[in-house]
């Protein structure tokens, strides 16, 4: 409810402009009222965990990504994971994998849910699966990118792609064949 934008989307669209910095400062003021903040969107996580520091902004709250938060809960036996019965593969969000080096946290949860296989191009070598923002001006390209990633998953025998990025999830869902 009271979550101002991190500045990640503006940074993507217009770079480190004054509007972007102002958005980041407004977000930082709210984040610093908390002890710990769980960040759901990988792009926001990179903005908050890395870019704020690069800009000299002081973050006092501990910031953890959603996959890392879930993995911590799972390791502490505070979270159980139901078995899926299918074959799963994890779609590494490039922002978590490349920018933050976070690739294993989500796998701890996915591996506990069932049989897991790895797509070619995983972890830091991940292949992008789409972007909500970019689909506004190049929908055909984003649809193709997502469709290609679905093919990658099928080629390794996966029937389910698990995503940590809402943006990639939306792109994959839109590109998925009916049924």
Predicted segment positions?
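Iron-sulfur cluster-binding electron-transfer modules in prokaryotic oxidoreductases
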Residues: 1-179
């Amino acid at each position: 409810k009271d979550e101002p934008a991190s500045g990640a989307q503006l940074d993507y669209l217009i770079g480190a402009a004054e509007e972007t910095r102002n958005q980041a400062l407004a977000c930082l003021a709210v984040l610093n009222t908390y002890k710990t903040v769980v960040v759901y969107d990988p792009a926001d996580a990179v903005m908050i965990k890395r870019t704020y520091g690069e800009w000299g902004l002081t973050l006092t709250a501990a910031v953890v990504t959603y996959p890392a938060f879930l993995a911590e809960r799972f390791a502490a036996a505070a979270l159980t994971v139901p078995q899926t019965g299918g074959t799963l593969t994890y779609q590494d969000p490039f922002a978590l994998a490349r920018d933050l080096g976070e690739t294993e946290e989500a796998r701890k949860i996915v591996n506990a849910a069932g049989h897991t296989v790895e797509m070619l191009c995983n972890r830091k070598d991940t292949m992008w699966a789409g972007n909500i923002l970019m689909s506004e001006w190049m929908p055909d390209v984003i649809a193709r990118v997502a469709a290609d990633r679905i093919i990658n998953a099928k080629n390794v025998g996966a029937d389910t792609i698990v995503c940590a990025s809402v943006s990639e999830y939306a792109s994959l869902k839109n590109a998925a064949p009916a049924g």
